[in-house]
Amino acid sequence: MPDFFPFPLLIGVVMLAILLAILWRRKRSPSHLFCFSVFWAYLLLVLRETLFPIPFLGGMDGMRTMQQATFVLSHVNFLPFKYFAFHNKYVVFREIALNILLTLPLGFGVSFIARLKSRGFLWLAFAAGLVIEIAQLVISLGIGGVYRTVDITDVILNAAGVLLGYGLFRIFARLYLAVTRRFGIEQHGLLACVHDVVSNAGSWRSAS
């Protein structure tokens, strides 16, 4: 079965170049551009792991037939942790770990790109996995077959990953400030960018 894989990496690199040019014109610092590039690379990796490759099932002609759409929808799982009962402990642990690790960098790193209040992280945690699962469902409907399992469990675990990443960021922020103040480390370049982000972390929380 051939795979429908429209050069997502190339498209992502082109989009990154355009966004960096826009940010540069808006006088963003080189450190911010670096953080943005790393975060963008992470997002491309997430897309690669969750959506690609897309199997090509004889023509991408919309929602296909009603029978195929019904078949796809019948394989959507809305019962949390339903399939865990059918696997051994190793498989269950692996699935939990991978789903959490997938979005953990999102919860940790998004603060270097945008300023979110604590409430915003709750919305981000919910949206992260939901967007991925909806995209998988739409693609499955479009190709007329189940190519990825759409499961509410993944949404829950992805949300947990975002919140865990945010918690680790909060810990990192406090440790970073404590260490730099204790040893009088000067903040220049990338360190200055990091210091600015972690210094403002407390104000985002209090404003929530």
Label for each model-derived stretch:
Residues 149-160:
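Individual transmembrane alpha-helices with interfacial aromatic-anchor signatures
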